[in-house]
């Protein structure tokens, strides 16, 4: 039996990964993390989506220690979430240091226990928000370290790594979940479901990608299939 664990926030990217995993694996588990995030409404959204999409199990893990260690606008109400700046340089203040290191490591430990062969994460470096822990080289390096540390071959899968946001919408549509992802996921840094606040970087990337996909469906779908190998 093929099993996978999805690092699941209830946002656009991880929900698209979950929709695909349900078709590619016999048994899918989800792991969601409560780190005291500003947009922690995503936890309830993740619970509802995991139930709706039919996962084998959904674990919500308390990692609020991260909130004490990692200072970010996503972990401190006193630090405002910045409006989207398309030409901004450097790492944004929404970056939570160590977040994906911790999430992927804990997901791999869970995968070890349930005998899953893969941990799936929705990170992407094509049009990402400047986070160093979304890069392909980081995921591969951590995957190697985790496998050495557990003497186990658990594969970190990144289905969205080389596709952009428009193509991510196409992937959701390919699996018949475009409306669900559009209406029921929570991507917004300010914790607003669906189209979100419309001001933060997450909302702008999401909206721009959706608009591009809806305006160029055939071309974007073809590009997504070419990059992912789907037919």
Swiss-Prot record:
ATP binds at residues 8-18. It comes from the Bacteria. Its cofactor is Zn(2+). Its EC number is 6.3.4.20. Keywords: ATP-binding, Ligase, Metal-binding, Nucleotide-binding, Queuosine biosynthesis, Zinc. It catalyses: 7-carboxy-7-deazaguanine + NH4(+) + ATP = 7-cyano-7-deazaguanine + ADP + phosphate + H2O + H(+). One of its GO terms (biological process) is queuosine biosynthetic process. Binds 1 zinc ion per subunit. Gene3D superfamilies: HUPs. One of its GO terms (molecular function) is ATP binding. Zn(2+) binds at residues 188, 197, 200, 203. Pathway: Purine metabolism; 7-cyano-7-deazaguanine biosynthesis. Catalyzes the ATP-dependent conversion of 7-carboxy-7-deazaguanine (CDG) to 7-cyano-7-deazaguanine (preQ(0)). PANTHER family: 7-CYANO-7-DEAZAGUANINE SYNTHASE. Belongs to the QueC family. This is 7-cyano-7-deazaguanine synthase. It comes from Salmonella heidelberg (strain SL476). The gene is queC.
């Amino acid at each position: 039996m093929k099993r996978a664990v999805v690092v699941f926030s209830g946002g656009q990217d991880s929900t698209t990964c979950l929709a695909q995993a349900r078709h590619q694996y016999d048994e899918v588990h989800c792991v969601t993390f409560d780190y005291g995030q500003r947009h922690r409404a995503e936890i309830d959204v993740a619970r509802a989506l995991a139930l709706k999409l039919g996962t084998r199990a959904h674990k919500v893990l308390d990692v609020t220690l991260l909130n004490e260690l990692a200072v970010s606008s996503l972990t401190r109400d006193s630090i405002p979430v910045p409006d989207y700046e398309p030409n901004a340089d450097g790492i944004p203040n929404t970056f939570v240091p160590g977040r994906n290191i911790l999430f992927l490591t804990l997901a791999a430990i869970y995968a070890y226990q349930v005998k899953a062969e893969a941990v799936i994460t929705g990170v992407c470096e094509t049009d990402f928000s400047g986070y160093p822990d979304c890069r392909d080289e980081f995921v591969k390096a951590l995957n190697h370290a985790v496998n050495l540390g557990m003497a186990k071959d658990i594969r970190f899968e990144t289905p969205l790594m080389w596709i952009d946001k428009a193509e991510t919408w196409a992937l959701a549509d390919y699996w018949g979940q475009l409306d669900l992802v559009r209406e029921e996921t929570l991507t917004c840094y300010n914790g607003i479901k669906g189209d979100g606040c419309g001001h933060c970087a997450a909302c702008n990337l999401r909206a721009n990608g959706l608009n591009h996909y809806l305006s160029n469906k055939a071309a974007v779908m073809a590009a997504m299939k070419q990059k992912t190998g789907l037919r």
